[in-house]
From Swiss-Prot:
Pfam families: Albumin_I_a, Cyclotide. Probably participates in a plant defense mechanism. There is a cross-link at G26-N55 (Cyclopeptide (Gly-Asn)). GO terms for biological process: defense response. Disulfide bonds join C29-C45, C33-C47, C38-C52. Keywords: Disulfide bond, Knottin, Plant defense, Signal. This is Cliotide T8. SUPFAM superfamilies: Cyclotides. The presence of a 'disulfide through disulfide knot' structurally defines this protein as a knottin. Residues 56-122 form a propeptide.
């Protein structure tokens, strides 16, 4: 009787493993993001309409910069939206929008501090 239980458990395990590898290879960002953010954000996924999509898919299907909070066409768009200070374009030139990042470099933070005043007032 123990062998029958182990055999059933082994069949279920192999079935679950094969389904997992099939889904993983086909849809890298297939999970839902209704209550929690995208778990697969490490591989370049973001939440749109309660489903996780690849970032370049979101940018390619967008009609305007306002379709997603991380889409941009210039660094000023990122700063205005408050989602970063650097707009990085995608390598695919057919995608007309970029993706906002927060670039925290020492030079960027000190650029306004090191400016000389235009006129000295006493």
């Amino acid at each position: 009787m123990a062998y029958v239980r182990l055999a059933c458990l082994a069949v279920i395990f192999f079935f679950a493993a094969s389904v997992m590898f099939t889904v993983e290879a086909g849809i890298p960002c297939g999970e839902s993001c209704v209550f929690i953010p995208c778990i697969s954000s490490v591989v370049g996924c973001s939440c749109k309409s309660k489903v996780c999509y690849n970032n370049h898919v979101i940018a390619a299907e967008a009609n305007s910069v306002d379709d997603h909070h991380l889409l941009c066409q210039s660094h000023d768009d990122c700063i205005k939206k408050g989602t970063g200070n650097f707009c990085a374009p995608f390598l695919d030139h057919a995608v007309q929008y970029g993706w906002c990042f927060r670039a925290e470099s020492e030079g960027y933070l000190l650029k306004d501090f090191l400016k000389m005043p235009k006129a000295l007032t006493n």
